């Protein structure tokens, strides 16, 4: 599970930061990539990475401001010409279906793969045997959501060496034991799968704030998260301005991470007014409250390891 930041700027593209998009690479887990937001030129940013558009399985949109969605029609269209045959599901607030379908319709675009557009509310928006994705409303002046991606616990590994030591050779019986079944061997011995399975591996959690003022729902999304990705549009000296524009300061992002007991904070959605050393000041302001903080930059990668 890896994060790749395709765009980390705010509002409009800048020379050093494109507008918002984050890829959650789940290549080992499910051979796919999920995107969170898809600002203008996201597909161009992808060209500078190893991501293959055909591997993009899901796109989660936080809200419908242009710097988060203007890249969506182009990417959805281009995926048809880049080997995309598998289904693509787009999740977002009310209006995402009209926006995307209208853009594709008036441009005469016909995708060659199953495209599903789901307008979401609060609660579980996706769940399978591996992951559960939860959305909650955040404070941004228009309908907007943050997301929590929670990996389900992975069953422990079968202790093959211990089985060999008691004379149980690899074969179909291993799968039964791995499933936790009780097995009677040919020699009459009975063994229990639970005795040969290691402890489960804790699932990982990553939370996305989207654009928002500080609010309780972001804390709920980020509770005990391995990583919280939180917008930091303003420095702490502009706290009032941040509130007026429904954004957060880096200091407020850190306060949220601390109160949610997150393990790591990654700042993004950084205004073009902050360059070079000014970005370091944003990080320092956050670190004073939540030490394990970094500021993302375009193409920054972070592996979310199991703990």
Swiss-Prot record:
Keyword S-adenosyl-L-methionine on entry: no
Domain of life according to the entry: Bacteria
Entry annotation: catalytic residues: 67
Catalytic activity: Endonucleolytic cleavage of RNA, removing extra 3' nucleotides from tRNA precursor, generating 3' termini of tRNAs. A 3'-hydroxy group is left at the tRNA terminus and a 5'-phosphoryl group is left at the trailer molecule
Cofactor binding comment, as recorded: Binds 2 Zn(2+) ions.
Cofactor(s) required, per the database record: Zn(2+)
Binding site for Zn(2+) 2: 67-68, 211, 269
Pfam family, one: Lactamase_B_2
GO molecular function: 3'-tRNA processing endoribonuclease activity; zinc ion binding
Keywords: Endonuclease, Hydrolase, Metal-binding, Nuclease, tRNA processing, Zinc
NCBIfam families for this protein: PRK00055.1-1, PRK00055.1-3, RNase_Z
Function: Zinc phosphodiesterase, which displays some tRNA 3'-processing endonuclease activity. Probably involved in tRNA maturation, by removing a 3'-trailer from precursor tRNA.
PANTHER family: ZINC PHOSPHODIESTERASE ELAC PROTEIN 1
The protein, known as: Ribonuclease Z
Highest classification ranks of the organism: Bacteria, Bacillati, Bacillota, Bacilli, Bacillales
